[in-house]
Amino acid sequence: MTFNIIKLENWDRKEYFEHYFNQQTTYSITKEIDITLFKDMIKKKGYEIYPSLIYAIMEVVNKNKVFRTGINSENKLGYWDKLNPLYTVFNKQTEKFTNIWTESDNNFTSFYNNYKNDLLEYKDKEEMFPKKPIPENTIPISMIPWIDFSSFNLNIGNNSNFLLPIITIGKFYSENNKIYIPVALQLHHAVCDGYHASLFMNEFQDIIHKVDDWI
């Protein structure tokens, strides 16, 4: 895990960062992602949808430095070389969830196998964060598979100055012979503008459409 320091005085985003950081401005955007081909391919290959979506999300995040920009435990501004997903897993018996992290991997099969191993070991632990220690370079991903939504927002008391993206996925639904899934993206305006939110959604849709290239 390498954290690269950003020298604020020389950063071309300095004015924007200081303005929105002082205001602590965050925002959310939700988009319906077409997963028609993706869902069919995942089913044919015998994979689960949730980890496959997590993999696709992390491909977009790790491709773009802006989504890896944050503040570390030493209160330094910078960006990580790579982020790992910290995702929720629901326990039907307790009706609570755990948060498990898995090492990111550019190879889908390797990531999927690591996910399955982590799931097997930690999913039944009655702790909120059973896999410890949790590295700093993680981003929160969750799924609410019981409901589709058109918007979703998290209200966070941002005393820790959390700048990284937060992604929430909803229940997939059918419309006009297509299958869609809502994806909510929460960003901090200090590091990400509307352009970057659009970049994430467009690249995520693209990698979902090109599932044949990586599965």
Curated annotation (Swiss-Prot):
Classification via InterPro entries: CAT-like_dom_sf (IPR023213), Chloramphenicol_AcTrfase_AS (IPR018372), Cmp_AcTrfase (IPR001707)
This protein's record includes keyword Transmembrane helix: no
Presence of the UniProt keyword Acetylation in the record: no
UniProt GO BP: response to antibiotic
EC numbers: 2.3.1.28
Gene3D superfamilies in the cross-refs: Chloramphenicol acetyltransferase-like domain (3.30.559.10)
Molecular function (Gene Ontology), one example: chloramphenicol O-acetyltransferase activity
Key words, A-Z: Acyltransferase, Antibiotic resistance, Plasmid, Transferase
Record field: catalytic activity: chloramphenicol + acetyl-CoA = chloramphenicol 3-acetate + CoA
Active site: 189
Assembly behavior: Homotrimer.
Protein family (similarity comment): Belongs to the chloramphenicol acetyltransferase family.
NCBIfam families named in the record: chloram_CatA (NF000491)
UniProt function note: This enzyme is an effector of chloramphenicol resistance in bacteria.
Name of the protein in question: Chloramphenicol acetyltransferase
Source species: Staphylococcus aureus
